[in-house]
């Protein structure tokens, strides 16, 4: 009985921790949002910033991206995340803005996905009541150009990046893990975008330096080989005849 009470007390305490984390997130959002707005204005001056960031994100993003997706994502101009609900700061609005392209109608270059937190009560294996947190959303109506829709046409095919905009989180057979992608975009990729970009640029510069060093080494080896060949080809000097 004492053990059961202890587990119940721990469960209640975990709920209090959860409430505290939400209060921290509220304060963090209050402080960060003006800074993110300033950053957005600065990033407009850096070509392909978000394209580089997505490439640097690795499997967290690339697992969803098909070759066709990547063609459109090359036109990505901006990603922005807003926590629009003061009472529930985990609710997010994720916006992706594109340059004019062959896929999207010109009146629909910004795709907006709102994701909300939904808490439901359930019981665990021991019969104790607990709260389950779900991420839910509404499908986004994307205006594709004729014949250019990137939504998968068959549910048997693996999901791709743009299927995220059709994900709802409500269907039990939904095979797209939109909750995980939402958390990654909102809590990792967006706030740490400059870090991803800087690391990618540093790695690229390092690769270029290594390439230059390798080319210089090859040039030096070629020069040494040429000098060696010249020495081998040089004829021996003739001895002068003695006069009688």
Curated annotation (Swiss-Prot):
Annotated protein name in UniProt: Putative nucleosome assembly protein C36B7.08c
Keyword Phosphoprotein among UniProt keywords: yes
Gene Ontology BP term (one): nucleosome assembly
Gene3D superfamilies hit by this protein: Nucleosome assembly protein
Pfam families in the cross-refs: NAP
Residues recorded with modification Phosphoserine: 211
Keyword check for Nucleus: yes
GO cellular component: CENP-A containing chromatin; chromatin; chromosome, centromeric region; nucleoplasm; nucleus
Organism for this UniProt entry: Schizosaccharomyces pombe (strain 972 / ATCC 24843)
Acidic residues: compositionally biased ranges: 201-232
Locations listed in the record: Nucleus
